[in-house]
């Protein structure tokens, strides 16, 4: 009987020591900021505000900005830049370096492009070499067999820098033959007197064609400027604006 009494008394003592289940504001509030004696489930630890377990801002478990679990910028879990998980990784938004387009590089030598190192000369469009008769069968045959060795483009300056066609053509022939001769000679090919004579005739015809083309374009540009600078056109444009 004594043993049974002692066991019963021990059970009653243990029951008194067991905590009661948490009710409203008792021993373990389910909601923050209610000051329950047992502490709530979302305590402000480390001096931070609501939801700051380590002193950061709202939703900052380790002191970073909004949505920054480890101190980085917005969307930066480990301190990198925007969209950068670790500073240098995951840079999906970084633009790729543009590649050089060789077509644009080649286009620099197209018709009308200013040639560097030639004092403002431009290189004309490629032309078909003219069919020229030199007055004897030998030279005619020689030309047909060697015409591919002669220039098919000419160097020239703008037509407004010359007082007449003859000056334009003379300058065009000299600079074109000089450049072609120097370039070809460096490749180990030499020209005879017959070659020079034929080149002069060929290049002269091409320079005349280039002058006519450039003169027509120049006068068309001038006509357009005169048209748009006339008072009626200016008045019409101002009315439309």
UniProtKB/Swiss-Prot annotation:
<feature type="repeat" description="2">
    <location>
        <begin position="53"/>
        <end position="60"/>
    </location>
</feature>
<feature type="repeat" description="5">
    <location>
        <begin position="77"/>
        <end position="84"/>
    </location>
</feature>
<feature type="binding site">
    <location>
        <position position="79"/>
    </location>
    <ligand>
        <name>Cu(2+) 4</name>
    </ligand>
</feature>
<feature type="compositionally biased region" description="Gly residues">
    <location>
        <begin position="45"/>
        <end position="88"/>
    </location>
</feature>
<comment type="function">
    <text>Its primary physiological function is unclear. May play a role in neuronal development and synaptic plasticity. May be required for neuronal myelin sheath maintenance. May promote myelin homeostasis through acting as an agonist for ADGRG6 receptor. May play a role in iron uptake and iron homeostasis. Soluble oligomers are toxic to cultured neuroblastoma cells and induce apoptosis (in vitro). Association with GPC1 (via its heparan sulfate chains) targets PRNP to lipid rafts. Also provides Cu(2+) or Zn(2+) for the ascorbate-mediated GPC1 deaminase degradation of its heparan sulfate side chains.</text>
</comment>
<feature type="region of interest" description="Disordered">
    <location>
        <begin position="18"/>
        <end position="100"/>
    </location>
</feature>
<dbReference type="GO" id="GO:0005794">
    <property type="term" value="C:Golgi apparatus"/>
</dbReference>
<keyword id="KW-1003">Cell membrane</keyword>
<feature type="binding site">
    <location>
        <position position="55"/>
    </location>
    <ligand>
        <name>Cu(2+) 1</name>
    </ligand>
</feature>
<feature type="region of interest" description="Interaction with ADGRG6">
    <location>
        <begin position="16"/>
        <end position="31"/>
    </location>
</feature>
<dbReference type="GO" id="GO:0005507">
    <property type="term" value="F:copper ion binding"/>
</dbReference>
<feature type="disulfide bond">
    <location>
        <begin position="172"/>
        <end position="207"/>
    </location>
</feature>
<dbReference type="Pfam" id="PF00377">
    <property type="entry name" value="Prion"/>
</dbReference>
<feature type="lipid moiety-binding region" description="GPI-anchor amidated serine">
    <location>
        <position position="223"/>
    </location>
</feature>
<feature type="binding site">
    <location>
        <position position="80"/>
    </location>
    <ligand>
        <name>Cu(2+) 4</name>
    </ligand>
</feature>
<keyword id="KW-0640">Prion</keyword>
<feature type="binding site">
    <location>
        <position position="78"/>
    </location>
    <ligand>
        <name>Cu(2+) 4</name>
    </ligand>
</feature>
<dbReference type="InterPro" id="IPR036924">
    <property type="entry name" value="Prion/Doppel_b-ribbon_dom_sf"/>
</dbReference>
<keyword id="KW-0325">Glycoprotein</keyword>
<feature type="glycosylation site" description="N-linked (GlcNAc...) asparagine">
    <location>
        <position position="174"/>
    </location>
</feature>
<keyword id="KW-0333">Golgi apparatus</keyword>
<feature type="repeat" description="1">
    <location>
        <begin position="44"/>
        <end position="52"/>
    </location>
</feature>
<feature type="binding site">
    <location>
        <position position="63"/>
    </location>
    <ligand>
        <name>Cu(2+) 2</name>
    </ligand>
</feature>
<keyword id="KW-0862">Zinc</keyword>
<comment type="similarity">
    <text>Belongs to the prion family.</text>
</comment>
<dbReference type="InterPro" id="IPR022416">
    <property type="entry name" value="Prion/Doppel_prot_b-ribbon_dom"/>
</dbReference>
<keyword id="KW-0336">GPI-anchor</keyword>
<feature type="propeptide" description="Removed in mature form">
    <location>
        <begin position="224"/>
        <end position="241"/>
    </location>
</feature>
<dbReference type="InterPro" id="IPR000817">
    <property type="entry name" value="Prion"/>
</dbReference>
<feature type="region of interest" description="Interaction with GRB2, ERI3 and SYN1">
    <location>
        <begin position="16"/>
        <end position="223"/>
    </location>
</feature>
<keyword id="KW-1015">Disulfide bond</keyword>
<feature type="binding site">
    <location>
        <position position="62"/>
    </location>
    <ligand>
        <name>Cu(2+) 2</name>
    </ligand>
</feature>
<keyword id="KW-0449">Lipoprotein</keyword>
<feature type="glycosylation site" description="N-linked (GlcNAc...) asparagine">
    <location>
        <position position="190"/>
    </location>
</feature>
<comment type="subunit">
    <text>Monomer and homodimer. Has a tendency to aggregate into amyloid fibrils containing a cross-beta spine, formed by a steric zipper of superposed beta-strands. Soluble oligomers may represent an intermediate stage on the path to fibril formation. Copper binding may promote oligomerization. Interacts with GRB2, APP, ERI3/PRNPIP and SYN1. Mislocalized cytosolically exposed PrP interacts with MGRN1; this interaction alters MGRN1 subcellular location and causes lysosomal enlargement. Interacts with APP. Interacts with KIAA1191. Interacts with ADGRG6.</text>
</comment>
<dbReference type="GO" id="GO:0005886">
    <property type="term" value="C:plasma membrane"/>
</dbReference>
<feature type="binding site">
    <location>
        <position position="64"/>
    </location>
    <ligand>
        <name>Cu(2+) 2</name>
    </ligand>
</feature>
<feature type="binding site">
    <location>
        <position position="70"/>
    </location>
    <ligand>
        <name>Cu(2+) 3</name>
    </ligand>
</feature>
<keyword id="KW-0186">Copper</keyword>
<feature type="region of interest" description="5 X 8 AA tandem repeats of P-H-G-G-G-W-G-Q">
    <location>
        <begin position="44"/>
        <end position="84"/>
    </location>
</feature>
<dbReference type="GO" id="GO:0098552">
    <property type="term" value="C:side of membrane"/>
</dbReference>
<keyword id="KW-0472">Membrane</keyword>
């Amino acid at each position: 009987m004594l043993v049974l009494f002692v066991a019963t008394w021990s059970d009653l003592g243990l029951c008194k020591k067991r905590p009661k289940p948490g009710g409203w504001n008792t021993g373990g509030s389910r909601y923050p900021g209610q000051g329950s004696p047992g502490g709530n489930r979302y305590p402000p630890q480390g001096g931070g505000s609501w939801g700051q377990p380590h002193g950061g801002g709202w939703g900052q478990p380790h002191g970073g900005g909004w949505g920054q679990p480890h101190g980085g910028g917005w969307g930066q879990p480990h301190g990198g830049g925007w969209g950068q998980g670790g500073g240098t990784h995951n840079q999906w938004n970084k633009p790729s370096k543009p590649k050089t387009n060789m077509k644009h590089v080649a286009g620099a030598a197209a018709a009308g492009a200013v040639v560097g190192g030639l004092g403002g000369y431009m290189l004309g469009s490629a032309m078909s070499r003219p069919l020229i008769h030199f007055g004897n069968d030998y030279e005619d045959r020689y030309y047909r067999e060697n015409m591919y060795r002669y220039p098919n483009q000419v160097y020239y300056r703008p037509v407004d820098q010359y007082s007449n066609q003859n000056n334009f053509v003379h300058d065009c022939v000299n600079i074109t033959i000089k450049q072609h001769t120097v370039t070809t000679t460096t490749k180990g090919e030499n020209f005879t007197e017959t070659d020079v004579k034929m080149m002069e005739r060929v290049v002269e015809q091409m320079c005349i064609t280039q002058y006519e083309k450039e003169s027509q374009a120049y006068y068309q540009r001038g006509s357009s400027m005169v048209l748009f600078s006339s008072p009626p056109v200016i008045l019409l444009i101002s009315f439309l604006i």
